[in-house]
């Protein structure tokens, strides 16, 4: 089944796998999902990313991270901000802070997909894709 909003689909799959305490989850591989997964890995929210499948139908295998004996998920929440029906843009001066800097906002900029902190450092704005904390 083709998803209209691949980012929301990815976030939902990660959220559901986290709640079920799964080790990994599969996400359809696109340029956008690869970039978002790479940012999540760099920020320490997920453990590992790999690809599987043939050329036509590739999937990202995302290994999730948990902490402690009770296996509490590192990702508390994922929230889609900019949606296909209502895009949300932010200039460099108005980039959002998530929970006072504890969480991250993932921004799609002209320089690629990056966190809000990196966008501030590079002095660029863009489309606010999602919040992760």
From Swiss-Prot:
InterPro entries: Ribosomal_uS8 (IPR000630), Ribosomal_uS8_CS (IPR047863), Ribosomal_uS8_sf (IPR035987). GO terms for molecular function: rRNA binding; structural constituent of ribosome. The keyword DNA-binding does not apply. One of its GO terms (biological process) is translation. GO terms for cellular component: ribonucleoprotein complex; ribosome. SUPFAM superfamilies: Ribosomal protein S8. Keywords: Ribonucleoprotein, Ribosomal protein, RNA-binding, rRNA-binding. PROSITE patterns: RIBOSOMAL_S8. It holds the Pfam family Ribosomal_S8. Part of the 30S ribosomal subunit. Contacts proteins S5 and S12. One of the primary rRNA binding proteins, it binds directly to 16S rRNA central domain where it helps coordinate assembly of the platform of the 30S subunit. NCBIfam families: PRK00136.1 (NF001109). Belongs to the universal ribosomal protein uS8 family. This is Small ribosomal subunit protein uS8.
């Amino acid at each position: 089944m083709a998803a209209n909003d691949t980012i929301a689909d990815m976030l939902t799959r990660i959220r559901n796998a986290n709640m079920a305490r799964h080790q990994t989850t599969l996400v359809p591989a696109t340029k956008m999902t690869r970039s978002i997964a790479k940012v999540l890995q760099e920020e320490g929210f997920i453990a590992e990313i790999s690809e599987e499948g043939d050329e036509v139908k590739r999937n990202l295998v995302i290994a999730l991270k948990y902490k402690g004996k009770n296996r509490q998920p590192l990702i508390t929440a994922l929230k889609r901000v900019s949606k296909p029906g209502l895009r949300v843009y932010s200039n460099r001066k108005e980039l959002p802070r998530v929970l006072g800097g504890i969480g991250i906002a993932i921004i799609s900029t002209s320089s690629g997909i990056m966190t809000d902190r990196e966008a501030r450092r590079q002095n660029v704005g863009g489309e606010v894709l999602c919040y992760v904390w």
